[in-house]
Swiss-Prot record:
Coiled coil: none
Descriptive protein name: Methionine import ATP-binding protein MetN
Record bears the keyword Translocase: yes
Entry's EC annotation: 7.4.2.11
Subcellular location: Cell membrane
Origin species: Lactobacillus johnsonii (strain CNCM I-12250 / La1 / NCC 533)
GO cellular component: plasma membrane
Classification via Pfam families: ABC_tran (PF00005), NIL (PF09383)
Entry keyword set: Amino-acid transport, ATP-binding, Cell membrane, Membrane, Nucleotide-binding, Translocase, Transport
Binding site for ATP: G37, F38, S39, G40, A41, G42, K43, S44
Purpose of the protein: Part of the ABC transporter complex MetNIQ involved in methionine import. Responsible for energy coupling to the transport system.
Main location: membrane
Example of a GO MF term: ABC-type D-methionine transporter activity
Length: 349
């Protein structure tokens, strides 16, 4: 099946700086695709090439089977580009609402170029507000709403032209954790109800793991890792990805509270991550029996990743180097992802 969004060898250069450096990305219809990285990684710059709010310096952009940009030039007319852009909704950290207009008027504003009658315009705007759970706030003004409610209005407005793609550019970064989860859950519901493809730009792994099915990790303008969320989450290959995963699994809490200087000579800390569906017994108890040792459990947690329960343990092993290797091999044979915890795992450098 052809990708709904196909970015090939995208480079975006500002002067001597390559904000995006030779990035290729395929996003299928119905994906919730997380684009994650720290500030300055090139996330927003890359994603804005999808609707050509940012023209690439090199590479090609294809959306819904139409090549929009190739060979350093636009492949369709300006009018056609405007039509394509209407089918790609966007929401941002700033809600960009019209403060002097009511909620329903803010939504209807996005339909000002449509051929709908006033009655049809009102009906559609109310339907969109119902989709985001704000039909009862239609006659309110933005100042009367909470931040989360204002973002819901922005989402309703972004859906006004019946897009099949929605880009969320750090849309939850200004919200509190509870409201963030509510907005993410709304995006997930819209994805399922409308078949909406969502491109989720964020620097928070918690946001990605809550709703995304695929992920791309960016650093300094390049893609360093991408794939199915479960695979990347359970088997991170790059240091930065391990850093994001470690933070999402609260490994940072372990590192910030544990005194490494007091570890015995052979003692090592490990993070164990595993699918509850894959591991049915106590892997630590099995390890103790297998190696005739006793692992100390410092931390344990279970969280849900795209509907799948994922377990996390932080354990302390006091074994010689050979036995440490045997322990890791044993755990990995049980479908457990093992990461040695040290002060370098979660550095932001």
């Amino acid at each position: 099946m052809a990708a709904q969004i196909d970015l090939k060898n995208i480079t975006v250069q500002f002067g001597q700086n390559k904000a995006v450096n030779d990035v290729s990305l395929e996003i299928n219809k119905g994906d919730i695709y997380g684009v994650i990285g720290f500030s300055g990684a090139g996330k927003s710059t890359l994603v804005r090439t999808i609707n050509l709010l940012q023209y690439p310096s090199a590479g090609s952009v294809e959306v819904n089977g139409t090549v929009l940009f190739k060979d350093n030039k636009l492949q369709i007319s300006k009018k056609q580009l405007q039509e394509k852009r209407r089918k790609i909704g966007m929401i941002f950290q700033n809600f960009n609402l019209l403060n002097e207009e009511t909620v329903i008027e803010n939504v209807a504003f996005a339909l000002q170029h449509s051929r709908l009658s006033d009655q049809e315009l009102e009906k559609k705007s109310l339907h969109l507000l119902e989709l985001v759970g704000l039909k009862d706030k239609a006659d309110f003004y933005p100042a009367q709403l909470s931040g989360g409610q204002q973002q819901r209005v922005a989402i309703a407005r972004a859906l006004a032209n019946d897009p099949d793609i929605l880009i969320s550019d750090e849309a939850t970064s200004a919200l509190d954790p509870k409201t963030t989860n509510q907005i993410l859950d709304l995006l997930y519901d819209l994805n399922k109800k409308l078949g909406l493809t969502v491109v989720l730009i964020t620097h928070e792994m918690d946001a990605v793991k809550r709703v995304a099915n695929k992920i791309v990790v960016m650093e300094k303008g390049k893609v360093i890792e991408k794939g199915e969320l479960r695979e990347v989450f359970l088997h991170p290959q790059k240091q930065l990805t391990r850093q994001f995963v470690g933070g999402a699994l609260q490994a940072q809490h372990i590192l910030n509270t544990y005194n490494f200087d007091k570890l015995a000579e052979n003692a090592e800390l490990y993070q164990l991550v595993y699918s509850i569906n894959d591991v049915t017994k106590s892997v630590v108890a099995d390890l103790d029996v297998s190696l005739n040792t006793k692992a100390s459990i410092l931390y344990g947690n279970v969280e849900v990743l795209s509907g799948e329960p994922i377990g996390t343990l932080a354990i302390l092993l006091n074994l010689n180097e050979l036995k440490q290797k045997e322990a890791i091999k044993f755990l990995e044979s049980k479908n457990v992802v093992v990461t040695k915890l040290d002060k370098g795992v979660l550095t932001n450098d």
